[in-house]
């Protein structure tokens, strides 16, 4: 089977559209006051959750030729959430919101003529600076049971 190759602004718009569909479903779960989402399944009772990765994994877009770009966009965001969940176990809604917004802004910049490779380098450089800042301001909690419990309580919602 031949592979479908997307390019130009039409392709970017399709990818962004799929990413936005997943983003819209997940963003409502953001933060301690995040809303619940009802997920209908083909079997059993619906699932009610405010867990971003659970919502992301439930979003399924058609991947036929006409909708492939949208399916790819949703998969980009879903993959970021799944990877973070595997590594950190939390923050999946945050990574969904950040990833979608970076993608949306990058799409605007590329449409305005910014070189995509230079844009990628800028995003990677900014990410490295953010990591340095977080590491600098991070507080070690290993061995401090009350701090560990406090962080776990915040994370649990």
Regions found by a protein language model. Give the residues of each.
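N-terminal glycine-/lysine-enriched basic segments
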Residues: 1-157
């Amino acid at each position: 089977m031949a592979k479908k190759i997307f390019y130009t602004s039409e392709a970017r718009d399709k990818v962004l559209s799929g990413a936005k569909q997943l983003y819209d479903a997940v963003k409502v779960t953001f933060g301690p006051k995040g809303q619940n989402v009802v997920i209908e399944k083909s079997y059993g009772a619906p699932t009610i959750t405010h867990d971003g990765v659970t919502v992301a994994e439930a979003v399924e877009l058609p991947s036929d030729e006409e909708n492939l770009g949208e399916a790819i966009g949703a998969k980009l965001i879903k993959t970021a959430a799944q990877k973070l969940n595997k590594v950190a176990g939390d923050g999946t809604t945050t990574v969904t919101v950040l990833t979608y917004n970076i993608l949306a802004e990058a799409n605007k910049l590329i449409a305005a003529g910014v070189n995509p490779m230079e844009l990628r380098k800028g995003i990677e450089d900014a990410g490295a600076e953010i990591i340095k800042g977080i590491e600098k301001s991070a507080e070690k909690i290993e061995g401090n049971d009350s701090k560990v419990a406090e962080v776990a309580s915040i994370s649990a919602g």
